[in-house]
Amino acid sequence: MIPKIIHYCWFGRGEKSKTIKKCLRSWEKKCKDFKTIEWNEDNFNIESHPFVKAAYEDKNWAFVSDYVRLYALNLYGGIYMDTDVQLVKPIDGFLENEAFLGFENKNNVANGLIFGIEKGHWFTQKLLADYDSILYVANDVNFRMKNTNTERATKILVDMGLKLNNQFQIINGIAVYPSEYFCPLDVNTFLMHKTKNTVSIHWYEGAWTSARYKEWKRQQIRRNRIDKVRCLPQRMLRKFLGDSTVDRLKSKIK
């Protein structure tokens, strides 16, 4: 059984944003009897692994976190979440799994959305061992894209039989949930697909991302809001008149 410990990483000693503080408060509210551990420069030895040391010197906090989350989960077990993950429901029901995580989309799983696992599990040990043969490369976009935890975790599970179909599966004891559970916000469109099964929302705050990406994200969200307002009259008509009536009226207008 997965222990009631929540791990998160905060390296670089920067100020936490309002979104991140809101997400952390949601953990306290939904997981009142969980222990929470913040991993940072004070309780993790940056010099303990060459990959972490190089990533830290490059101020690539995301890659530092990629390693440290696995270290923490392997040592203690528990739950890891990125700091921009908001809980909307309790997670106690998932603790009966020996390990669980979720699809980010139909193409990959992600262990930053929420990743629960028993201590000393083969999956964290395998992911950790990979870092012994990875040389960190600074300022290389191709390296960053190919060496995230998401990419490597997905590859391991696919090699063991995971089907990239965004459907619930259990692979060698690891429960993989559809994106509606832990990732209802589409990272490409920033459209929300929340359902009755949604447990958490990853807001893609991306503290390590570029200003260009953040501006693109703001513009995308703005366009989505404009489209939502523009389509409001038609949605209201469909709600009160029904789809068939609205479609019939539209065909007559044409």
Regions found by a protein language model. Name each.
Residues 67-78:
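Small-residue hinge/turn detector
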Residues 1-65, 83-254:
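Glycosyltransferase-associated regions of secretory-pathway enzymes
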